[in-house]
């Protein structure tokens, strides 16, 4: 069906009329949201907020937590719940986030991305085009929740399905909605050819039509960055300039930093049990298993790096979907799975080797930590949008995975460690600015 949300809801309503209560699906009948039992919400909570965070990265979860923490200071009785997938649910549990119980029924976006990936390769646009059934399945769960519970505000951080299907069917909207994103539209990879350029242009045209045909559907649209972070150029042939269009339809907050107040670096290093004199290198590849190839390439470079940097201590953060047992670790290398305070390690270490995700690279930039980043091949955000943003801060060194050897990785590490010019400062109030905009909707 061209309009699967509407068809599914018609089928649901038809079945509801003809099934007994015992036969009906339990979806929509939920127990109390899960979270830290010490967190208690007043029965007279001023507002109920449903946060819907993208499944694509833990960094997006960290920024949403930062925004939520500010919201709680502005509205002490607020009830914030997350509709989220693993591994984000683990991050939320570690930070007292309340997870809506329907989250356990969500289809896995992370598993889909992993199935679409190759050796340090992920054609993000093509992967998105092939996840329709995941988007619609998760939207149906979302719609059941907002129809059966009284939420005052939905905060959709790159929750593409929610935004798309509510725009297609505005009558389904049940609460105020705030759209949060760190990118506007799709960009074709230069090497992908004319077909991808035509397809991204069509997707962008549909997005523009949705927003301009229903200008009041989004109660606010927040770009998590600054106007300069949008690359120059149009959305495609015959379409508006992306930056100019975004300036008309978005409010800009700067990037919300989870590590905005991590404290003095020496104290932070001590709290993480980093020893004086160590040169700590953190390797981090995000919340999916796509980064396994990058970890192996970096591990192969470790013996050379250790020879050149005798005080080197390498800590690999494999992430929640990769077991440390997966890797043949050289002597002296530590490997950890899920680390809920990764942002602190990124702020405290001497150098980081990471994938090309925006959240991680911006956290490193804000902390002033030197880093190398290896964008996933074919991933337009990591190859086009992230480097464009980082250039404004003179931060990070972009490395091409396919061209990187052990020697070139070590040489780049040495150059970054000895670099004297500091990165440009990053605004620290992005979470506060975003939360204040959201607060106006409560």
Question: What function would you assign to each model-found segment?
Answer:
Residues 170-188:
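Active-site proximal beta-strand in glycosyltransferases
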Residues 341-385:
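A donor-sugar binding/catalytic signature common to diverse glycosyltransferases
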Residues 1-32:
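Catalytic active-site module of serine/aspartate enzymes centered on a nucleophile-bearing elbow/loop
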Residues 74, 78-130:
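Conserved nucleotide-sugar phosphate-binding/catalytic loop shared by glycosyltransferases and other
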Residues 116-163:
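Conserved nucleotide-sugar donor-binding subdomain of glycosyltransferases
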Residues 253-351:
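Donor-nucleotide binding loops and adjacent catalytic segments primarily
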Residues 187-289, 319-321:
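A nucleotide-sugar donor-handling region in carbohydrate enzymes
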Residues 53-65, 291-293:
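A short, glycine/small-residue-rich beta-strand->loop->alpha-helix junction that serves as a flexible
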């Amino acid at each position: 069906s061209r309009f699967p949300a509407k068809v599914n809801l018609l089928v649901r309503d038809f079945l509801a009329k003809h099934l007994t209560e015992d036969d009906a699906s339990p979806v929509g009948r939920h127990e109390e949201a899960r979270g830290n039992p010490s967190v208690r919400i007043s029965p007279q909570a001023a507002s109920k907020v449903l946060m819907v965070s993208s499944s694509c990265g833990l960094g997006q979860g960290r920024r949403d937590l930062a925004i939520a923490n500010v919201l709680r200071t502005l509205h002490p009785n607020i009830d914030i719940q997350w509709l989220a997938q693993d591994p984000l649910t683990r991050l939320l549990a570690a930070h007292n986030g309340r997870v809506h119980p329907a989250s356990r029924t969500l289809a896995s976006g992370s598993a889909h991305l992993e199935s679409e990936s190759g050796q340090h390769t992920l054609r993000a646009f093509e992967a998105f085009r092939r996840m329709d059934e995941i988007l619609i399945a998760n939207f149906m769960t979302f719609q059941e929740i907002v129809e059966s519970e009284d939420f005052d505000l939905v905060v959709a951080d790159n929750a593409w399905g929610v935004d798309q299907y509510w725009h297609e069917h505005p009558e389904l909207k049940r609460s105020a909605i705030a759209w949060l994103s760190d990118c506007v539209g799709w960009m074709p990879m230069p090497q992908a050819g004319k077909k991808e350029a035509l397809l991204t242009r069509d997707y962008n045209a549909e997005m523009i039509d949705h927003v301009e045909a229903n200008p009041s559907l989004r109660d606010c649209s927040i770009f998590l960055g600054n106007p300069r972070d949008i690359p120059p150029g149009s959305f495609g042939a015959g379409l508006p300039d992306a930056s100019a269009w975004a300036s008309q339809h978005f409010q800009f907050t700067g990037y919300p930093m989870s590590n905005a107040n991590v404290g003095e670096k020496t104290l932070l290093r001590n709290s993480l049990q980093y020893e004086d004199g160590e040169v700590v290198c953190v390797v981090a590849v995000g919340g999916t298993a796509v980064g396994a190839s990058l970890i192996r390439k970096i591990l192969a470079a470790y013996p050379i790096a250790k020879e050149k940097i005798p005080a080197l201590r390498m800590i690999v953060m494999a992430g929640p979907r990769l077991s440390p047992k997966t890797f043949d670790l050289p002597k002296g290398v530590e490997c950890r799975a899920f680390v809920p305070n990764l942002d602190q390690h990124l702020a405290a270490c001497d150098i980081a080797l990471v994938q090309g995700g925006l959240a991680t690279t911006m956290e490193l930039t804000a902390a002033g930590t030197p880093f190398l980043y290896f964008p996933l091949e074919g991933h337009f955000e990591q190859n086009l949008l992230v480097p464009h943003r980082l250039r404004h801060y003179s931060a990070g060194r972009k490395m091409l995975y396919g061209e990187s050897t052990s020697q070139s990785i070590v040489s780049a590490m040495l150059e970054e460690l000895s670099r004297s010019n500091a990165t440009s400062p990053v605004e620290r109030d992005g979470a506060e600015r975003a939360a204040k905009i959201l607060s106006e909707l409560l």
